Amino acid sequence: DAGKSMQALADRIETLAKDKSTTYVVQQKMAEELLLDFYNVDSKNWVKEDGSLDETKVSDYLTQVKRIYDVDDHSDIESYGNFFESGMCDGYRYGTLDSMDLFTETCKVEFGTIADVEDFQLMLSAGTTDGAVYGVLSNGGTSSYVPFLQAGVVSGGNEDAGKAFVKTLLGKEAGASSNGIPVNEAALKDQINALMGRTETSMAFNRDGSDKMYTIEYRSMTQEEADAILAQLEAVEQSALTDRTIQNLVIEQGTSYVKGEQNLEETVNAITKKVNLYLAEQQ
């Protein structure tokens, strides 16, 4: 049920905070990281029919993020952490979900973006030992995705060549050869089916610079798990807002609010005023 809305998740996290059995309640993230994770979940709901931002929905988004942030002490990660944004590094797509804190029992809740189907396998493998469950986080009843395009663009007027390029880009071979969740259905099914095969892969790691080593054994996915993942991916309908100017404004102002540097009303007014002015200029 916590995955049905940000408020339900915040309620659940505050309840879990009463049990002090783990170092943190939520996977440690900087304010910017929390704001971006939930921006990707909720921003699709903000734009009204007239093209302006809905102040009430922006206010609720900020309120729920701050509730989650305030549950834990973030002084360590804020002092040395770097803002980790879902994106590209050396040509490789990565997400913001880190299943290792649950595996090492240093937190009770983790969330973030899934970059490829192998992230599902890691998440399921990490949750095997403690019975953790996962769900698609949505707000307003519709789950969202973070669109990503990796392509070469050439100027010119060759329409046939352009069509052939797009066809190749969206084809099974291109989807299978790159990191990320492919839009090609055949490529996606092949990637999921591959994770049902036998695997003996393991990964050793430590946390927070300690000498203690952990080893996680990757396990094969079951048919039921594979079917569930495919159904979840196929059910995604809307993308998060993709305009970087809007995203940057929200994250910048939201960080000041989450850290207690300005109040909610000031933050909402600053975001809606600047974003609505920007949107009006784009029309």
Predicted regions mapped to residue ranges:
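Bilobed periplasmic-binding protein-like "clamshell/Venus-flytrap" ligand-binding domains
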Residues: A17-K29, A174-E185, L277-Q283
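Conserved C-terminal helix/tail region of periplasmic/extracytoplasmic solute-binding proteins
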Residues: M203-Q283
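Extracytoplasmic/periplasmic substrate-recognition and gating elements
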Residues: M123-A194
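A ligand-binding cleft/hinge motif common to bilobed small-molecule-binding domains
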Residues: F103, G112-T129
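Short helices/loops that flank or line small-molecule/ion binding pockets
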Residues: D11-T15, Y80-F111, A115, E252, ...
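Glycine-centered hinge/linker elements that transmit conformational signals in sensory
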Residues: I13, K48-R93
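Extracytoplasmic/periplasmic solute-binding protein
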Residues: S5-L53, K57-S59, E105
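Non-transmembrane alpha-helical segments in soluble domains
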Residues: A10-A17, L36, L62-Y69, G162-G171, ...
